[in-house]
Amino acid sequence: MRPVASFRPPPTFSALQGGASSQATKTAGIDQRGTNQAFSLLDPQSTQSNSTDSSFGEMGNLLMNQVKGVNSMQNQADSMVHSMLTGGDVNEAEVLTSVQKADLAFRMLMQIRNKLMDAYREIQQVQI
């Protein structure tokens, strides 16, 4: 009889934020700061609402702040790529990391949007 491989549960949200990094990420050289920055976009306490518009609501302001954060990350990545392509003094690893951070943040934002749209459609189908 073959021995059963030990079960390793998936990492928790705090572990993904950098609380407990795995050996694989250490050996792969993944920048934990970029992951933390991308996951901080999902943390409602990390964003502050500058607007007090009650018609849009706190959730709407939170989402707008997240969109603005992702947009700024993408703009930063674009400017770094442009600087690298035009011969600027930019480290290639920093450019790649910046592009990957922006990509991860955008993908997470799209997943949030998809979940919100699914919830909205489900609410629409509720019989009154």
From Swiss-Prot:
It comes from the Bacteria. One of its GO terms (molecular function) is cytoskeletal motor activity. One of its GO terms (biological process) is bacterial-type flagellum assembly. Residues 33-55 have a biased composition (Polar residues). GO terms for cellular component: bacterial-type flagellum basal body. Belongs to the FliE family. NCBIfam families: fliE. PANTHER family: FLAGELLAR HOOK-BASAL BODY COMPLEX PROTEIN FLIE, PTHR34653. This is Flagellar hook-basal body complex protein FliE. It comes from Rhodopirellula baltica (strain DSM 10527 / NCIMB 13988 / SH1). The gene is fliE.
